Amino acid sequence: MASDRQNLQDAFLNHVRKTKVPVTIFLINGVKLQGVITWFDNFCVLLRRDGQSQLVYKHAISTIMPAQPISLYEGEDSN
């Protein structure tokens, strides 16, 4: 069933959250944030760095770049 399949955004965010991979988040105004994603929902991401948490609204995010390569769908086509 197609609705059982997780969307790419949720799969990506869940993977970096579970594995605690550090990320760099670029906002649409050019600001660069770095840290570990500890939580997310449909509207925002919680980013933690040096014991501080930042609530970042998804509509302000341009790009999320993990600090290391990640593999989301092992064994599947790269399509």
Swiss-Prot record:
Disulfide bonds: none annotated. GO terms for biological process: regulation of DNA-templated transcription; regulation of RNA stability; regulation of translation, ncRNA-mediated. It holds the Pfam family Hfq. Signal peptide: none annotated. Residues 10-70 form the Sm domain. GO terms for molecular function: RNA binding. InterPro entries: Hfq, LSM_dom_sf, Sm. SUPFAM superfamilies: Sm-like ribonucleoproteins. PROSITE patterns: SM (PS52002). GO terms for cellular component: cytosol. Keywords: RNA-binding, Stress response. The keyword Ribonucleoprotein does not apply. Belongs to the Hfq family. Homohexamer. HAMAP family: Hfq. RNA chaperone that binds small regulatory RNA (sRNAs) and mRNAs to facilitate mRNA translational regulation in response to envelope stress, environmental stress and changes in metabolite concentrations. Also binds with high specificity to tRNAs. This is RNA-binding protein Hfq. The lineage of its organism: Bacteria, Pseudomonadati, Pseudomonadota, Alphaproteobacteria, Rhodobacterales.
